[in-house]
A protein has these predicted regions:
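A conserved regulatory-domain signal marking ACT and ACT-like small-molecule sensing domains
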Residues: 1-146
Length: 146
């Protein structure tokens, strides 16, 4: 199952992350995880939020251009080698990881990785065949808030 990620382009200068975070807070939308990648002139803020549709609406009304990308959330054992074992599944199928980021919890031994694959359906099929838990939007939200 694919989940929805919001991407915003921000100028690469101090203070640019504050306003989109304020917009989301004012709408009662929680940021579940994020990553910020920079280039010389701009940054790409990627967000997984509690309500992606409402977040998109609120951010667009505030003047932001919001791109929605389908990504794959995968639950992996938070132990040495957990990620390496999973990544091996993609090598022989030539499935490319365009980018990824992750978060962990202090209360259990699981990590959640967010992936952007060049072949998401093939990646999901491979993960499920290996018995790896591919999460849905609601599961990502639930695992972070419980």
């Amino acid at each position: 199952m694919k989940i929805h990620q919001l991407s915003l382009f921000l100028e690469n200068r101090p203070g640019q992350m504050t306003e989109p975070c304020r917009v989301l807070a004012a709408a009662g939308i929680s940021i579940r995880t994020l990553t910020l990648a920079d280039t010389q002139r701009f940054g790409i803020l990627r967000l997984i939020v509690s309500d992606w549709q409402q977040a998109r609406t609120q951010l667009e009304e505030a003047g932001y251009v919001v791109n929605i990308t389908e990504v794959v959330a995968v639950e992996v054992s938070d132990r040495p080698g957990g990620l390496a074992t999973m990544l091996e599944l993609f090598d022989d199928r030539h499935i490319n990881i365009e980018y990824m980021y992750a978060f962990t919890f202090s209360r259990d031994d699981r990590a959640v990785f967010i992936f952007r694959f060049d072949q998401p359906d093939a990646a999901i099929e491979r993960l499920r065949a290996a018995g790896i838990n591919v999460l849905e939007d609601v599961e990502v939200y639930h695992r972070i808030t419980v």
